[in-house]
Amino acid sequence: MDNPSVTLIQRQGYQFEHHYAPGIPVLLADEPAPFGTGLGPDPVELLASAVGNCLSASLWFACQKYKDDPSPLRTEVKATVGRNDKGRNRVQGLAVDLHLGKPAAELGHIQRVLDTFEDYCTVTQSVAPAVPVTLRVLDSSGAVLKG
């Protein structure tokens, strides 16, 4: 990965277009009411998406390394937002549930994957020192494998 960049251009009010590399669709972000109109994800949702996507991709990569196929993956991220001691809103935590599309018994190297994949998630490992991230990994039967 080189040095990724994004250019934000204000459309109106709290709406910002996120322009990535050529060929990547523009993403519209917006604040929810009463500030914005809620036409796109807000910055907290984008942070949650980045953490969830990175963990999902990291788990997928680790499984592929061992020729395991956990698909289809489904990841839910819930952000906790509250006020700090100065009364400012802050993301106080991110709770991630990563659901495998298969039972653990069908994934021959799942324990090795679970022991290592988190360490390779660039976004989560960068965010976690400031925002606590809790992670659970569940198989398709709902059994908790991690967390």
Q: Each PLM stretch: what is its role?
A:
Residues 1-49, 57-147:
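Extended beta-strand/beta-hairpin segments
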